[in-house]
A protein has these predicted regions:
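N-terminal export signals
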Residues: 3-22
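Active-site-proximal alpha-helix that buttresses catalytic centers in soluble enzyme cores
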Residues: 18-205
């Protein structure tokens, strides 16, 4: 059926999702963002200051990149969501993040509840206290990543990637990691093309 559709519709050859299916590529986009893990309806304008900036504005910085990639490649997109949501107050949120990191907490998750079979996982996250959010440890502990490929993308501030990739390798030791897409949040608005070039090179490579 796929072969017939491609023959009948030459324009379909231009669609990344169709090309991916033709190559047998199985991939998903999964991400963690602060915005998706707060009670959005409780966010007040006074909560959004220079520090929180776009992190608390819909759809969130990491989510924005995830949707760029997912929509461009025709992939399903899943947010990682914790059961116990985070506060919108930056300093209080940071205190909890540091505590979770120090105590090596595995936060309980409410999503994603299930994923389709995949060979390639685009995994997005912020730099949280110089490492990956502990929710990623929870997610990766429940997902089969042995012999899978993880393509990490991180939106960060002046701390850069810090220990995020080192700790990601520890959380998924049997996975293959691609080159990381690192985006400074101050350059996010101009980063769409770079993000898509990165994703397409991995996806169709």
């Amino acid at each position: 059926m796929l072969r017939r559709n491609l023959l009948l519709s030459p324009l379909a050859l231009c669609l990344p999702s169709v090309l991916a299916q033709a190559k047998g590529k199985r991939a998903v986009v999964v991400y963690f963002s602060w915005y998706d893990n707060t009670f959005q309806e409780r966010i007040r304008p006074s909560d959004i200051d220079e520090t929180t900036s776009a992190s608390l504005k819909a759809p969130g910085q990491v989510a924005l990149v995830a949707h760029w990639i997912g929509k461009d490649l025709g992939l399903p997109i899943y947010p990682i969501v914790v059961k116990d949501r985070y506060t919108t107050i930056y300093e209080d949120c940071l205190d909890r993040v540091i505590e979770e990191k120090t105590e090596r907490v595995f936060p309980e998750l409410t999503g994603p509840t299930a994923l389709p079979e995949f060979d390639l996982l685009f995994l997005g996250f912020p730099n949280w206290s110089y490492t990956i959010p502990r929710a990623l440890w929870s997610f990766l502990s429940k997902v089969q990543t042995a012999n899978k490929t993880i393509a990490p993308f991180c939106v960060h501030g002046t701390g850069g990637l810090a220990r995020t990739i080192r700790d990601l390798k520890s959380a998924a030791p049997e996975a293959r990691l691609t080159r990381t897409l690192s985006i400074d949040r101050s350059e996010l608005a101009e980063s769409r093309k770079r993000a898509l070039d990165w994703a397409q090179n991995i996806y169709f490579g």
